[in-house]
């Protein structure tokens, strides 16, 4: 198999990407990354033909478009910064558009009772932790299907699990730390169903490095016949993220049940769904500014827009802050200290950039002086010019002085009295350019705190440049 000549690929790079303040060495590395990524995951046939240098055509461009469409990126056929960012993420080694084909059609196990064997163990974890991680991964799939799984200690099992490194004689060598973490084969005889984990990775049972339970649950989905999902919230999404609780999204459940049917449980499990930025029914749990940007939070996810990138960025909260819980209920930025404070229940966390500050979480009672009757905060914002922070709880609000570190006297007050027209409850709020933006359900109210008037009423997701709401 031949490679595209490096000079031609660099010419391709110069034509299809915008100017980067990067060294020639960096560009060469990125060109090599693009070629290898598309060959491995998008079946790019590297036959040595010249890449078109002046038109958006040719095999590399078409495969780039295919990859960008799969990951929900802006489809340009150009190796832009967002595309390279995705390519550099650790991920599963199974291709996105061509499975490890062993049999024609849609492979599945004919029997519902399957066996598995762990052939060897990683030294990164105690054996009991490895056993537990793999067992829990199988349970995720058995909970939603008629499938059952039994661990055996010797002989040939339906699904053989091993920790290997480099070239391990399956025509899909591992690449060292990072990059390709693991892979598994679709159901079938011999190597079919087997799962291999790269021993050059550091496997853990927490959010650090690579969580074995999380990766195993994904790979076993392949062992059962699933391919990759384009849903970023699905366990079968190809890139690795750890979002705290490892669970099947509804997309995963729908996929596996399409192959094996529903479980025999009287109550059918339901998985979380990934929010869609332009869903007219979209609501938010919390919103805050952070260093000039606005971040929107929903369940396990954050959403944000970037003036340099028109697409809405959607990802797990844990990508930025792995120590924060999912389902945040309120957030606000205190710019004077470059802090953002996140609330859930009666606890809150303070972060600077991507770092959760030492000593958190703390409780809202000793820190802010809330009465014990307050069980959680619905929404919060802080006025940068006054140091006053507003906390909205049910139909009332408190005002806190950040500099005196105490509640202002005379509070709580009624929301409806001091913020006429926005209703009795606030789901989320933030301040930008001197205006308060209140959110309740699918509605957003732009409020002028000086005149105490609502200026505009829009859909909650109006910040996302959706064509239709």
Swiss-Prot record:
Catalytic center residues: 219
Positions glycosylated per UniProt: 120
Catalysed conversion reaction: Cleavage of the triple helix of collagen at about three-quarters of the length of the molecule from the N-terminus, at 775-Gly-|-Ile-776 in the alpha1(I) chain. Cleaves synthetic substrates and alpha-macroglobulins at bonds where P1' is a hydrophobic residue
Sequence positions that bind Ca(2+) 4: 285, 329, 378, 427
Predominant location: secreted
EC number, as in UniProt: 3.4.24.7
Annotated SMART domains: HX, ZnMc
Keywords noted in UniProt: Autocatalytic cleavage, Calcium, Collagen degradation, Disulfide bond, Extracellular matrix, Glycoprotein, Host-virus interaction, Hydrolase, Metal-binding, Metalloprotease, Phosphoprotein, Protease, Repeat, Secreted, Signal, Zinc, Zymogen
Renumbered ranges of motif Cysteine switch: 90-97
PROSITE patterns cross-referenced by the UniProt entry: CYSTEINE_SWITCH (PS00546), HEMOPEXIN (PS00024), HEMOPEXIN_2 (PS51642), ZINC_PROTEASE (PS00142)
Enzyme class: hydrolase
GO CC, alphabetical: extracellular matrix; extracellular region
Modified residues (Phosphotyrosine): 360
UniProt: Zn(2+) 2 binding residues: 92, 218, 222, 228
Pfam families found in the cross-reference section: Hemopexin, Peptidase_M10, PG_binding_1
Cofactor or coenzyme needed: Ca(2+); Zn(2+)
Entry's cofactor comment: Binds 4 Ca(2+) ions per subunit.
Highest taxon listed in the record's lineage: Eukaryota
Site (Not glycosylated): 143
UniProt free text on domains: There are two distinct domains in this protein; the catalytic N-terminal, and the C-terminal which is involved in substrate specificity and in binding TIMP (tissue inhibitor of metalloproteinases). The conserved cysteine present in the cysteine-switch motif binds the catalytic zinc ion, thus inhibiting the enzyme. The dissociation of the cysteine from the zinc ion upon the activation-peptide release activates the enzyme.
Protein name in the entry: Interstitial collagenase
């Amino acid at each position: 198999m031949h490679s595209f000549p490096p000079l031609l690929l660099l010419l391709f790079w110069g034509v299809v990407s915008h100017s980067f303040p990067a060294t020639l060495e960096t560009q060469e590395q990125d060109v090599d990354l693009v070629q290898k990524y598309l060959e491995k995951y998008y079946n790019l046939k590297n036959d040595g033909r010249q890449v078109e240098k002046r038109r958006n055509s040719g095999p590399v461009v078409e495969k780039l478009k295919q990859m960008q469409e799969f990951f929900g990126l802006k489809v340009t056929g150009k190796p832009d910064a967002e595309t390279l960012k995705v390519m550099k993420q650790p991920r599963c080694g199974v291709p996105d558009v061509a499975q490890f084909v062993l049999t024609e059609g849609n492979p599945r196990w004919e029997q519902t009772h399957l066996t598995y064997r762990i052939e060897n163990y990683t030294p990164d974890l105690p054996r009991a932790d490895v056993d537990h991680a793999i067992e829990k991964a199988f349970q995720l799939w058995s909970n939603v299907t008629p499938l059952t799984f039994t661990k055996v200690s010797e002989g040939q099992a339906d699904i053989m699990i091993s920790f290997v490194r480099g070239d391990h004689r399956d025509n899909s060598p591992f690449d060292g730390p990072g990059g390709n973490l693991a892979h598994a084969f679709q159901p079938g005889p011999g190597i079919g169903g087997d799962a291999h984990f790269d021993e050059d990775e550091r496997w853990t049972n927490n959010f650090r490095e690579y969580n074995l339970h999380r990766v195993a649950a994904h790979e076993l989905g392949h062992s059962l016949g699933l391919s990759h999902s384009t849903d970023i919230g699905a366990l079968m999404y190809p890139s690795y993220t750890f979002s705290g609780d490892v669970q099947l999204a509804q997309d995963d459940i729908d996929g596996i049940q399409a192959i094996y049917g529903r479980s025999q449980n009287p109550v059918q499990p339901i998985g979380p769904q990934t929010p869609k930025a332009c869903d007219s029914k979209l609501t938010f749990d919390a919103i805050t500014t952070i260093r000039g940007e606005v971040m929107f939070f929903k369940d396990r996810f954050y959403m944000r827009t970037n003036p340099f990138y028109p697409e809405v960025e959607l990802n797990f909260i844990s990508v930025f802050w792995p120590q924060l819980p999912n389902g945040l209920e309120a957030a606000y930025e205190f710019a004077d200290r470059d802090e953002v404070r996140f609330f859930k229940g009666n606890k809150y966390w303070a972060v600077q950039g991507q770092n959760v500050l030492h000593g958190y979480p703390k409780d809202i009672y000793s820190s802010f002086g809330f009465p014990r009757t307050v069980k959680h905060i619905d929404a919060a914002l802080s006025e940068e010019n006054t140091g006053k922070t507003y906390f909205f709880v049910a139909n009332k609000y408190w005002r806190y002085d950040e500099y005196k570190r105490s509640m202002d006297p005379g509070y709580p007050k009624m929301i409806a009295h001091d913020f006429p027209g926005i209703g009795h409850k606030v789901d989320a709020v933030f301040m930008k350019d001197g205006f308060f933006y209140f959110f309740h359900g699918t509605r957003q109210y732009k409020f002028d705190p000086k005149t105490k008037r609502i200026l505009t009423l829009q859909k909650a997701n109006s910040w996302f440049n959706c064509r239709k709401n």
